[in-house]
């Protein structure tokens, strides 16, 4: 479980960076979508870690608050980029 959490967590900024380095906004949007999927996967692993006793509830709540904040940032970035594509 620990390796899955690390992999999902590392995938989020990696996909954002890769998307930003692409030539087209649509490609960036695609990578943001992948990053969002990795974030959702991370949230799931955190919840499961609490249920099976790898992390305690306080740790998981703190981490889930951070994932929620990241999710909102990704959504705002996505909306901003979608406006560029529509223009």
Predicted regions and their residues:
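Short, C-terminally biased terminal segments at protein or domain edges
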Residues: 1-87
